[in-house]
Design a protein with these regions (language model features):
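Conserved alpha/beta-hydrolase
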Residues: 106-128
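Alpha/beta-hydrolase active-site loop
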Residues: 128-149
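Accessory cap/linker subdomain of secreted extracellular hydrolases
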Residues: 32-42, 187-253
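Short beta-strand element of the alpha/beta-hydrolase
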Residues: 66-76
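Secretory targeting and sorting signals
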Residues: 2-29
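Primarily recognizes the serine-hydrolase "nucleophile elbow" in alpha/beta-hydrolase
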Residues: 154-207
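Short, solvent-exposed loop/turn and secondary-structure capping segments
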Residues: 79-93, 131-134, 169-171, 191-197
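N-terminal cap/lid segment of alpha/beta-hydrolase-fold proteins
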Residues: 30-68
Length: 253
């Protein structure tokens, strides 16, 4: 009798487990709506991967050619920054951004949609240096895309800065999941290498253009992140000045 009860409980537990596994994908099903994006009426779908990353993909419903561009965004700060400290491309005060990103700009995304491509991307499950988990998120997102867009013939992975390195690593580890990759302005392969690269750049900027730029000795925690953000603003100001000077020189010829 005891054995029969045990067997019945085991079977019931197995059925519950199998049911949970069977319905798990539904928990991550995308929510879709039609939107006018540039010259295209696109289906914009969003959801979350199993690690909690927000994702989005957009499809030209009238002219999808079967190719999806999978974008990996660059480095985003992992802490909030107070007003007055504005990271490049961010806002002030800066709030950690977990939103999905499907391309480098609205213009580029809309041009791809108009040409018949679909675009996709996520916000990853965390910010900061997040290469490892970002690759995992991308692998899962590719599975979602191929499931929900059955006409998909291939995926092109692309990304910029840290997103470029994520793209490169994805292509090396999972070459069969994509048909091509386009790493853009790729970051160095790990945090130490990236910091060394950044220090070299800062040293050059400090030596030749702005002695107030800090190369090392940052404070711990958010205060140090704030110092780094201010430094980046100074570097951008230097680069802007250089670019303006070059244009003025060219125009004077």
């Amino acid at each position: 009798m005891k054995k029969s009860r045990f067997a019945a409980l085991a079977v019931a537990a197995s059925l519950v487990t199998m049911s949970a596994v069977a319905i798990a994908p539904a928990a991550h099903a995308s929510s879709c709506e039609a939107k006018q994006l540039g010259s295209v009426i696109a289906e914009v779908c969003s959801g979350k991967t199993s690690d909690g990353a927000n994702y989005e993909y957009r499809t030209n419903t009238e002219n999808f050619n079967g190719t999806v561009y999978l974008w990996s965004h660059g480095y985003r700060y992992a802490v909030n920054l107070p007003a007055g400290i504005q990271p490049p491309g961010g806002t002030t005060p800066y709030i950690v951004d977990m939103s999905a990103e499907v391309g480098p700009s609205t213009y580029v995304v809309n041009q791809l949609l108009a040409a018949g491509y679909a675009v996709a991307g996520s916000g990853f499950d965390t910010q900061g240096w997040t290469v490892g988990s970002a690759i995992k998120t991308n692998v899962e997102l590719i599975g979602i895309l191929k499931s929900e867009l059955p006409d998909t013939k291939g995926v092109i992975a692309w990304g910029a800065s840290m997103g470029g390195f994520i793209t490169q690593a994805l292509a090396e580890r999972f070459p069969k999941l994509i048909k091509s990759a386009a790493p853009i302005c790729t970051a160095a392969g790990n945090v130490n290498a990236e910091l060394t690269y950044a220090q070299d750049l800062l040293w050059g900027m400090k030596t030749f253009f702005d002695p107030s730029i800090t190369v090392s000795g940052y404070a711990d925690g958010p205060a140090g992140v704030g110092q780094a953000a201010l430094n980046l603003q100074k570097v951008i100001a230097v680069l802007t000045h250089i670019g303006t000077t070059i244009l003025e020189t060219d125009n004077s010829k």
